[in-house]
Amino acid sequence: MVGVKPVGSDPDFQPELSGAGSRLAVVKFTMRGCGPCLRIAPAFSSMSNKYPQAVFLEVDVHQCQGTAATNNISATPTFLFFRNKVRIDQYQGADAVGLEEKIKQHLENDPGSNEDTDIPKGYMDLMPFINKAGCECLNESDEHGFDNCLRKDLSFLESDCDEQLLITVAFNQPVKLYSMKFQGPDNGQGPKYVKIFINLPRSMDFEEAERSEPTQALELTEDDIKEDGIVPLRYVKFQNVNSVTLFVQSNQGEEETTRISYFTFIGTPVQATNMNDFKRVVGKKGESH
C-alpha cells in the first residue's frame, strides 16, 4: 500500500496490523493541533511513497484512546514499528532524518515482502528480531566477516585459521525457534557438523564448545545448505530463546576454511509485545509519569 492510511477507531487498529503481515508497519501516533506532528507530516507522507514495501499508518491519540493507552503513548509524535503484529521498535520526535534512518535500518533486515512459501503458516523469518550489536563471531576472517551472512547477496562469512566458527546471535526479545536456514556453497566449504546452544550466561570458547552438551546437534547435508533448504529444530527445546550460540565444527569437504552464505531462524516471538516497553504505568489522560 502506498500512502499513509489513517486508522479511524480502536477496533480498526489490529486488522490493519494483521493486513501488513510480515511487512514492516510504521505507525505514527499524532494529535490534532500538535505542532511537531504537523511539521513532520509531509516527510512522513513522502516516506510512505518512497518505501512502498512498508505499510504506513496514522493514529490520532484522541480518536483511538484505547490504542494509544495499550501502546503506552505519552508524547506525540511517536512512531512505533511492527512486524507480524509484534512491536519491534519505536522512535519519538519530529526529526525526519532520524525517522528515515530508523525505517531504512529495519528495511535492511527485511526478509522480503514476498513471504517464503517454505515457511509454515503461523511462523516468520526472525531476522528483524536479531540484535546485531549483541552478536559475536570467533575465528571470522577480516575480509569476510559475520555481517555478510545476515544479508542475501553474494557476500559470505568465512572462517580464518581453520574450519571452525563460534557464532553468538542475540535477539531483541524472547523468541520460539521452529527451524533455521543455513546456506553455504557447494564447493565443500559449507558447514556440516553444528552444535547449537541457547541462553548461555556468558560467551564460551572453542574448548568449552567442543566438550559441552548442546541443546541440539546438527549434521547438515548438501541439500540442507542449498538456498531452499530448511533445517528443523526440536521445537520443544527452543521455547524461550534470548540468544543462540552456533559452534560450526566442520565443513562438507574437510576444506581448510568454512563459508556460510546466509543464515536465519524461523519461529515466532514469545509474546506479541515487548514488555520492556511497558514499564511505565499508564495513568489518566493528562497525567505525566
Curated annotation (Swiss-Prot):
Keywords attached to this entry: Cytoplasm, Disulfide bond, Electron transport, Nucleus, Phosphoprotein, Proteasome, Redox-active center, Transport
Annotated disulfide bonds: C34-C37
Residue stretches making up the PITH domain: 115-285
InterPro entries: Galactose-bd-like_sf, PITH_dom, PITH_dom_sf, Thioredoxin-like_sf, Thioredoxin_CS, Thioredoxin_domain
Gene3D superfamilies associated with the record: Glutaredoxin (3.40.30.10), PITH domain (2.60.120.470)
UniProt key word Transferase: no
Protein name: Thioredoxin-like protein 1
Gene behind the chain: Txnl1
